[in-house]
Amino acid sequence: MELDEWFETYLESRYGCRDEAVEKAWDILRKTVYANEGNYESAITARPTFEKHNNWAYTDIPYDPVEVIKAWKYLLQAADRLGKNPCYRYDLILVGKQVLANYATIIQQKFGEDYRTKDLPAFTRNSREFMELIDDMDELMGTHEAFLLGK
């Protein structure tokens, strides 16, 4: 079975129907997130650093993070049709979490550069945005019981 055909069959089985927007989203994901090997780690869960990678963390994103945003937007287009499907909701939240994690890595690099250049106003602004992003991610993850502590 060809990979394209396998994905179509898998998605129809997972969501209970075929959906063009969902298929576009997963096509993007398999060509970006799932096409890369390695140990990419979110700046949120990595050991604190101002660097993209060191002995403890590798936060250099191995794909274009804008593509994951596009995939999330495609998934969101299916909300009216698939919103009650638990697998769809799970995947929607997980891809959204990845979008936020990727953005956190970008912000982390900004405030790392702010620290190196001693730009206190920018460092304060970007580090605050990083902390707010953690709250946003926590709020998103809290919308599905599979991501709640104790479940």
What do the predicted segments below correspond to?
Residues M1-K151:
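Substrate-binding groove of N-acetylhexosamine-processing glycoside hydrolases
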